[in-house]
Amino acid sequence: MHIVVCIKQFPGFGRLVSSSSGRRQLTATQPRSDPESQRGRTSSNRLTWRGALEWPRAASALDLGIFPSRR
């Protein structure tokens, strides 16, 4: 299990998640949780959704707001 140490919110782009392993992944933000993301979407959607598919557990957990270290 990966421990999320730092979460940065990018408006309309996604979340940059830095895990304890040192890897960084972009998780897609859900439209229902962040309506602003609909307007700021660009061609970088591939990278965003790729990160979401790579870390399905982390993405869903972040959307639910389980991690208290969220800034």
Curated annotation (Swiss-Prot):
Specify the superkingdom.
Bacteria
> Where is the segment annotated Disordered?
20-46
What residue spans carry the Polar residues bias annotation? 20-32
Task: Please identify the protein, giving its name as recorded.
Answer: Uncharacterized 7.9 kDa protein in fixW 5'region
